[in-house]
């Protein structure tokens, strides 16, 4: 059935609900590996120059975002282990979240992707699905569980 489950987290409540579902599945199928990924949007030098302006600080946005993503993944791994998950690995990637999640799932041969309905940047009163979860569900080659 499932060997690898990829869970996309961003620190939002819905991404932690997605993690809970992956943990529940691992309890039913103990040999399942849970891969936790947090993707931060990489900023080009041009984008960085618009917001900061000093050449020496051009890489600060990526450093800050990368560190935040690492914290999110580490927190998610700790939560997973506290809730009984055994085989858990964490990954941090830069890029467009939906594309990176779909490609990473293909590269790691994930059998299932679990995402929250809306992430940290979603409009609370907007559509039923956030743009990342919608794009992942539309483009993934494996099943996607939206929580």
Regions found by a protein language model. Give the residues of each.
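Short, hinge-like loop/turn segments at secondary-structure boundaries
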Residues: 51-55, 106-108, 131-132
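Small/aliphatic-rich secondary-structure junction motif
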Residues: 1-56
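Glycine-rich, Arg-bearing micro-motifs that act as flexible, cationic patches
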Residues: 115-138
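Short hydrophobic/aromatic patches at helix-to-coil boundaries
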Residues: 143-147
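Structural beta-alpha unit
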Residues: 75-113
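A short acidic, glycine-rich active-site loop
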Residues: 56-70
């Amino acid at each position: 059935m499932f060997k690898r489950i990829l869970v996309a987290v961003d620190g939002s409540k819905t991404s932690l609900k997605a993690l809970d579902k992956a943990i529940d599945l691992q309890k039913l199928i103990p040999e399942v590996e849970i891969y936790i990924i947090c993707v931060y949007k990489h900023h080009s030098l041009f984008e960085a120059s618009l917001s900061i302006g000093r050449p020496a600080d051009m890489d600060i946005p990526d450093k800050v975002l990368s560190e935040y993503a690492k914290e999110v993944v580490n927190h998610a791994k700790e939560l997973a282990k506290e809730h009984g998950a055994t085989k858990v690995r964490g990954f941090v990637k830069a890029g467009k979240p939906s594309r990176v999640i779909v490609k990473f799932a293909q590269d790691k041969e994930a059998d299932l992707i679990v995402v929250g309905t809306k992430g940290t940047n979603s409009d609370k009163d907007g559509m039923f699905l956030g743009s990342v979860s919608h794009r992942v569900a539309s483009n993934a080659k494996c099943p996607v569980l939206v929580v």
